[in-house]
């Protein structure tokens, strides 16, 4: 199990990313627009740098929804490989069965 503080930190990052999403997209649009003046683009870069670091979506970590495990998480289920296997063996995931050939 992951520490509660690590789970809480990830939740905080998700909320911050949602809060600053529109602002971040607008600034990135200005930066990548070739029709913007160099001064406008530079101002946008500086404003983007002043945003909180944790508001960037790339700082979020995929974690298991049950255990908080950061590695081996299957996006389709939102669970770690261990919990997916346990649930599949109990028949709790419809349509998923153990491979046999």
UniProtKB/Swiss-Prot annotation:
Compositional bias of kind Polar residues: 52-68
GO cellular component: cytoplasm; small ribosomal subunit
Annotated GO MF terms: rRNA binding; structural constituent of ribosome
Keyword field contains Endoplasmic reticulum: no
Alphabetized UniProt keyword annotations: Ribonucleoprotein, Ribosomal protein, RNA-binding, rRNA-binding
Residue span of region Disordered: 51-70
SUPFAM superfamilies registered for this protein in UniProt: Glucocorticoid receptor-like (DNA-binding domain) (SSF57716)
An annotated GO BP: translation
Gene3D superfamilies reported in the protein's UniProt record: 1.10.287.1480
Its job: Binds 16S rRNA, required for the assembly of 30S particles and may also be responsible for determining the conformation of the 16S rRNA at the A site.
Family according to the record: Belongs to the universal ribosomal protein uS14 family.
Assembly with partners or alone: Part of the 30S ribosomal subunit. Contacts proteins S3 and S10.
Descriptive protein name: Small ribosomal subunit protein uS14
Naturally occurring in which organism (per UniProt): Mannheimia succiniciproducens (strain KCTC 0769BP / MBEL55E)
Gene this chain is encoded by: rpsN
């Amino acid at each position: 199990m992951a520490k509660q503080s690590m789970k809480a930190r990830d939740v905080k990052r998700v909320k911050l990313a949602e809060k600053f999403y529109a602002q971040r997209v607008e600034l990135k649009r200005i930066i990548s627009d070739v029709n913007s003046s160099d001064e406008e683009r530079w101002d946008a870069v500086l404003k983007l740098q002043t945003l909180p670091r944790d508001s960037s979506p790339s700082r979020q970590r995929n974690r298991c929804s049950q255990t908080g495990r950061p590695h081996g998480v299957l996006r389709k289920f939102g669970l770690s490989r261990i919990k997916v296997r346990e649930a599949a063996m109990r028949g709790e995931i419809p349509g998923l069965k153990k491979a046999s050939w």
